[in-house]
Amino acid sequence: MLETYHFMKKYYYLLITIFLLASCEEDIKFNTPAFQSLKDNVFWRAQNYSAQAKAGGGVYISGGLGTNVVTLKLPSLETKTYVLGVDNLTAASYSDRFAIDKPEFTTGTNKGSGQVVITEFDNNKGTISGTFKFTAVNTNAEDLENPSVTFTEGVFYKIPYTPLVNFNN
């Protein structure tokens, strides 16, 4: 009887070990493409994203989460570092697309600071990748509760790029 007890105990432990090993699995999700950052030190990941050519040259790279959108405006697709807060050709903004009384934040000439780095532009696959960080100023100077917003550790990775479509052939 004691032998049966020890056998059952070993059998029980073996079943538990097998069950635990079988229930462990790796759920690896690759986040490709991606547009994410820390917004005021809180993780922020876009649900939708795009990169589009603009009529005067350059590109808009944007990521949206619900009604909130981050837009990076760059004068070219050249892989390099673009400094924000110097001019209006290179700018970053954050806003709520549908809110009437929500603040809108932007960088521009002598306004805000930061940088956008294009690390890769793959013309064959039509994707763009890079990093960003910026502090954008509230466009409503009277809003003392929300003077600025800061995005750090920002990454856009393999965002689909749409070139400017010319309908005049």
What kind of region is each of these model predictions?
Residues 1-7:
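Short, Lys/Arg-enriched N-terminal segments with co-localized hydrophobic residues
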Residues 35-39, 43-47, 52-127, 137-139:
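Surface-exposed helix/loop patches within compact recognition domains
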Residues 25-27:
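Bacterial signal peptide processing site
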Residues 121-169:
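C-terminal or internal capping secondary-structure element at the end of a domain, subdomain, or sheet
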Residues 9-14:
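Sec-dependent signal peptide recognition
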Residues 32:
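Acidic, metal-coordinating catalytic segment for phosphate/diphosphate chemistry
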Residues 20-23:
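C-terminal motif of bacterial Sec signal peptides marking the signal peptidase cleavage site
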